[in-house]
Amino acid sequence: MKVVKTASAGTLESNDVLVTVEPGEGIKLDIESVVYQQFGQAIRATVMDTLAALDVTDATLHLNDRGALDCTIAARVETAARRAGEGV
């Protein structure tokens, strides 16, 4: 899927994550999380797996995590990517 515009999904509420996807070259992740020290690698892996499943290869993502579960992170990334993309 090609990312053609900026789109977001999620909230800044506790146990949620706000994901913003915008066009870019390669995959660039900017992760801000209250649990980054403990779960940063798991968050990054969940995002990369979700993008791979959607065939997204060029995008910049900004995540503002408030302790979201992996399933929530995956759902927010997928929703934001589909909103930003073409060829869904």
Where are each of the predicted segments found?
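N-terminal intrinsically disordered, cationic/polar leader segments
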Residues: 1-88
